[in-house]
């Protein structure tokens, strides 16, 4: 949905402002205090309101791409809500939203907003993009695996555990990723009636009923599994992010330093899985990271990737884009295909040496 981002500054002081073509994956790198987290915040604010913020420090404007006619009805259906009992619905209108947040909008105007999103960006964002944008940052990633309400199974799901509990395909996809990462099987435990909890089991459930049921066999199965709240912060952070991505199915995903709490190999795994999930042509992933392993995972996924290096020195901001075509050339060169080369993107200066012995001396 996001087509391009125009910044307020360019490659160097005095040059034309840089414009970033939004690929499925856009990675923001650079030293500390260069604006990586700030640009994610400004993207999120735009997706929620659709209006330009005069207080923006980095982003001048954001362009949106129209929704294709063949998937238009599917996109509308994805955010359409049923009227509550006694709630008045005007002719030709629908309720759109997510969870408790809802708007009554003209169906014709909604379709037009998705077909020509740049004509009325406020409508496009407030009616659609606001409900399809997810940000994962340091404030919420550990808490994503905490207990959630089971809700009324007769009503639409509006929390991630509720979605996974009802959708066998999504639940099994999350389980596959977690098993490949940690060697244990993620299951959803409904035996605390009215609540849903995540557990890690040494054995997979024999069938869906053993996982989703409350009969004696299901209770015993979950009792033998470890509550995920007893796992390490790295396991909880990784599981929470994967769960939210697959259950929420966002069109725009914003991740701020996803490598926090993770071993380098897990950072690589997360980058690869996230990029695979978000590689659909109409989805966009924006990441601010300090991890060359995460960046390498994104590249290894095969999804188109842009790397944007941000800097801020002596009150001068710069942005340099490493486009996907150049990244492919870099990765096809055996001498340059390493996380050591990518790690140079995160520093102010890089020293190139002849051998490992020289490198060790400078380190």
Regions found by a protein language model. Give the residues of each.
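Short active-site oxyanion
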Residues: 162-163, 283-284, 348-350
């Amino acid at each position: 949905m996001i087509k391009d981002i125009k910044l307020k500054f360019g490659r160097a002081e005095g040059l034309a402002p840089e414009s970033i073509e939004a690929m499925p994956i856009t990675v923001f790198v650079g030293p500390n205090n260069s604006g990586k987290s700030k640009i994610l915040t400004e993207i999120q604010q735009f997706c929620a309101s659709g209006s330009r913020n005069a207080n923006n420090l980095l982003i001048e404007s954001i362009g949106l791409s129209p929704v294709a006619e063949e998937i238009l009805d599917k996109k509308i259906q994805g955010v359409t809500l049923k009227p509550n009992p006694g709630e008045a619905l005007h002719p030709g209108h629908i309720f759109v939203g997510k969870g408790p947040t809802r708007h009554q909008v003209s169906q014709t105007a909604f379709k037009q907003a998705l077909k020509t999103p740049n004509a009325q960006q406020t409508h496009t964002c407030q009616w659609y993009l606001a409900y399809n944008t997810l940000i994962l940052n340091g404030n919420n990633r550990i808490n994503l695996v905490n207990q959630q309400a089971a809700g009324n199974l007769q009503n639409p799901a509006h929390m991630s555990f509720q979605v996974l509990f009802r959708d066998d395909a999504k639940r099994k996809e999350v389980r596959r990723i977690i098993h490949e990462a940690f060697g244990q099987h993620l299951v959803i435990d409904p035996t605390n009636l009215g609540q849903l909890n995540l557990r890690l089991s040494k054995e997979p459930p024999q069938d869906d009923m053993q996982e989703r049921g409350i009969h004696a066999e299901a209770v015993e199965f979950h009792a033998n599994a470890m509550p995920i709240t007893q796992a390490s912060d790295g396991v909880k952070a990784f599981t929470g992010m994967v769960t939210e991505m697959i259950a929420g199915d966002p069109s725009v995903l914003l991740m701020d330093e996803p490598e926090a709490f993770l071993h380098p190999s897990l950072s690589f795994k997360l980058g690869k899985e996230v990029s695979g999930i978000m590689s659909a042509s109409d989805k966009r992933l924006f990441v601010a990271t300090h991890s060359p392993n995460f960046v390498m995972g994104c590249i290894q996924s095969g999804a188109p990737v842009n790397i944007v290096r941000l800097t801020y020195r002596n009150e001068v901001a710069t942005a340099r884009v490493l486009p996907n075509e150049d990244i492919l050339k870099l990765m096809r060169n055996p001498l340059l295909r390493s996380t050591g080369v990518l790690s140079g993107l995160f520093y102010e200066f890089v020293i190139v040496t002849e051998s490992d012995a020289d490198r060790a001396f400078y380190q």
